[in-house]
Swiss-Prot record:
Residues 129-220 are annotated as: 6 X 5 AA repeats A of L-E-E-[SKR]-[ERK]. Residues 345-366 are annotated as: Disordered. This is Inactive protein RESTRICTED TEV MOVEMENT 2. Residues 163-206 are annotated as: 3 X 14 AA repeats B of [IMA]-[RK]-K-L-Q-E-E-A-K-A-K-E-[EK]-[LA]. The gene is RTM2.
Length: 366
């Protein structure tokens, strides 16, 4: 029987070459012998199986070739009816697999008539035809199984590809959503940071404006204090000048003309009255000075406390109004004191100037 080869491939890149090995039947009186030529195969690369349901012997084997190719075979042989199944045995020598199938009854071919031999040959031919039919049917089934297997494998690969595609799409969608969320979070964070920075800058500007206003208020209060001190100093200087003038008027002696032409000092009575008048004015001025000094001292203490509060940023609107009222009151008191002093001094000077003129007219020499 001539060998035939057929190439088959799989999805894994391995190619199989199928072939039909040469086989030969030998009928002997004691047993039926089947010889199969398996050149190139080793004993470990083949397998012999007896199928009880169909009373057939299946011989399979495969061996690797070069370039990811394999050589394989799958043959089925019908076991003769006059055979002891449990005594079938085989051997592999010189690349030939020999399967021996002992007979139940030993026949002697030499004594068989010619008709028996013809019947035996016909039976053998029929057995070979049956064997060929079974072999073709077995190959057809194997082919169908292989096609079904390939179809199943293809469907599985398509299913895996679809699952992989869906997973990739889901992963890409998830990454896009995650990226979008990260961008939104970053934008919100930047907006919050910007808003916080703007609030800090606005707060700093407000603090600077408040500090500038406090500085202006301190400067105004300082200028007001300096102006009040200058006015006080001016009034005190004017008062001291007026007092020195009055003292000169008081200490100036009066010239009295007598009959003898001598100059005499003023009378003690008139001097004592004038002195007492100026003493009253001095007391008024002194009282005004004491009140003014107390008011100035109080103002200085209050000014120090206010300045301390301004430095500590604790001054209130009521304290500001109080400072303004104190300044105005001080100015009024200073003006009143100056006016009183000036009035008394003027009256004293007019009275003293009128006294010498009257005395001189009365004491004019005859």
């Amino acid at each position: 029987m001539a060998a035939r080869q057929q190439q088959k491939g799989t999805g894994f890149g391995v190619q199989y070459e199928d072939f039909v090995p040469k086989s030969e039947w030998k009928d002997q009186p004691e047993a039926t012998i089947l010889n199969i030529d398996l050149t190139g195969f080793a004993k470990e690369q083949m397998k012999v199986t007896y199928v009880h349901s169909s009373k057939m012997i299946r011989v399979t084997g495969e061996r690797p070739l070069a370039n990811r190719k394999w050589n394989r075979f799958n043959e089925v042989f019908t076991v003769p009816q006059n055979c002891l199944v449990d005594k079938i045995h085989g051997s592999f020598k010189k690349n030939v697999l020999t399967i021996t199938m002992p007979k139940e009854t030993i026949t002697k071919v030499a004594y068989l008539p010619e008709t028996s031999r013809t019947e035996a040959a016909a039976l053998e031919k029929a057995a070979k035809l049956e064997e060929k039919r079974l072999l073709e049917e077995s190959r057809r089934k194997e082919k169908e199984e292989e096609e079904a297997k390939q179809m199943k494998k293809q469907l599985l690969e398509e299913k895996e590809a679809l699952i992989r595609k869906l997973q990739e799409e889901a992963k890409a969608k998830e990454e896009a959503e995650m990226r979008k969320l990260q961008e939104e979070a970053k934008a919100n964070e930047e907006a919050a940071a910007k808003k916080l920075q703007e609030e800090i800058e606005a707060k700093e500007k407000l603090e600077e404006r408040k500090l500038e206003e406090r500085r202006l208020e301190e400067r105004k209060l300082e200028d007001m204090k300096l102006a009040e001190e200058a006015k006080l100093k001016k009034i005190q200087e004017r008062k001291s000048v007026d007092e020195s003038g009055e003292k000169e008027k008081i200490l100036k002696p009066e010239v009295v003309y007598t009959k003898s032409g001598h100059v005499a000092t003023p009378k003690p009575e008139s001097g004592s009255g004038l002195k007492s008048g100026f003493g009253g004015v001095g007391e008024v001025v002194k009282s005004a000075e004491e009140k003014l000094g107390n008011l100035v001292e109080k103002e200085k203490k209050m000014g120090k406390g206010i300045m301390e509060k301004i430095r500590r940023k604790e001054i209130t609107s009521e304290e500001k109004k109080l400072m303004m009222n104190v300044g105005v009151a001080a100015l009024v008191i200073f003006a009143l004191g100056a006016y009183v002093s000036y009035t008394f001094c003027s009256s004293s000077s007019s009275s003293s100037s009128s006294s010498p003129s009257s005395s001189s007219s009365s004491t004019k020499p005859e």
